[in-house]
A protein has these predicted regions:
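Conserved NAD(P)H cofactor-binding loop of Rossmann-fold oxidoreductase domains
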Residues: 82-87
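Conserved glycine-rich cofactor-binding loop
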Residues: 14-15
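Flexible N-terminal pre-Rossmann segment of NAD(P)-dependent oxidoreductases
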Residues: 1-9
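Conserved glycine-rich Rossmann-like NAD(P)H-binding loop of the short-chain dehydrogenase/reductase
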Residues: 28-42
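A short, exposed helix-loop element centered on a Lys and neighboring polar residues
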Residues: 113-114
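Rossmann-fold cofactor-recognition segment
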Residues: 49-62
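Substrate-binding pocket helix/loop in short-chain dehydrogenase/reductase
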Residues: 89-90, 97-99
Length: 114
């Protein structure tokens, strides 16, 4: 059990890869801090494994990320699963959607890593 008692933050943990990863880390004995913007699905995740700590977090919000991460001492691992994809032709992507993509895919990774 190499992950036993390791403190791991998993972003986008409410569904998909983030959820599967959070559950797998918890099963291996890690202390998992699961974040997502979808609080309802985070609550479902907590019901699946009571050892997972959940927190509603917009990982593109600098002050929220800073406050949250500073509340956890000695983080061992960050598993950043947040992602946003524009589906369709790039010519149909407006500047707001492009900015959202940059914020979610790049800026949030920068904030969480700091």
């Amino acid at each position: 059990m190499r992950l036993k008692n390791k403190k791991i933050i998993v972003t986008a943990a409410a569904q998909g890869i983030g959820k599967a990863t959070a559950l797998a880390f918890a099963k291996e004995g890690a202390i998992v801090f699961a974040t997502d913007i979808n609080e309802e699905k985070l609550i479902e995740l907590k019901k699946a494994n009571s050892n997972i700590e959940i927190f509603k977090l917009d990982s593109t919000n600098k002050s929220d990320v800073s406050n949250y991460c500073s509340s956890i001492e000695d983080i061992d691992v960050l598993f950043h699963a947040v992602g946003f994809v524009h589906h369709g032709n790039i010519m149909d992507c407006d500047s707001n959607e492009f900015q959202r993509s940059v914020n979610v895919n790049i800026y949030s990774a920068f904030l969480m890593t700091q």
